[in-house]
Amino acid sequence: MESNLSRIIMKKWTVFATLFVMTFGYSQNWKTNFEETKQQASKENKNILLVFSGSDWCAPCIKLDNIVWKSEAFKTEAEKYWVIYKADFPKKKANQLSPELTESNNKLAEKYNKNGSFPLVILLDKTGKVLGMTGFKNISAPDYIQLIHSLEK
């Protein structure tokens, strides 16, 4: 009986550990506070990658997320060169953001995305000055990363 209990506990622990690694192993280091994003960028002397997304309704946003943002190539490159912030504008009730985050994202949209383009990818310097911008391109993650780097010039 004790042996069965040990096996059950071990199986549950293994499932939990696997799910934990899958969840956090694939997660991005996306910031949720833009002021902290700017502070980190200044401290680390990095540019800011600001992404306007409609994560649950914008098909090109979802495709960009799956092809580029979730790729290992992007994760590695972002860690080296950028502090990343996603200003998300979900529509489904289940995906709604906190009122504070919604307000913050709205302020960012007023400043950087007045036309309401989705997705909109903006490269900023550490002070928040726009260096360049782009949108969805149906290209590979490495090609999109090069596109972002081209905005640095």
What are the residue ranges of the model-derived segments?
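Bacterial Sec-dependent N-terminal signal peptides
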Residues: 1-29
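Thiol-based oxidoreductase modules, predominantly thioredoxin-like and allied folds used
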Residues: 30-31, 74-103
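A short beta-strand-turn-helix
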Residues: 31-48, 78
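Short active-site neighborhood of thiol/selenol oxidoreductases, capturing the structured segment around
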Residues: 44-58
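Hydrophobic beta-strand anchors of alpha/beta hydrolase catalytic cores
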Residues: 49-50, 84, 121
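The canonical Cys-X-X-Cys-His
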Residues: 58-61, 121
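Typically the conserved alpha-helix immediately C-terminal to a functionally engaged Cys/Sec
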Residues: 61-77
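Non-catalytic, surface beta->alpha helical segment in thiol-disulfide oxidoreductase systems
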Residues: 110-111, 115-153
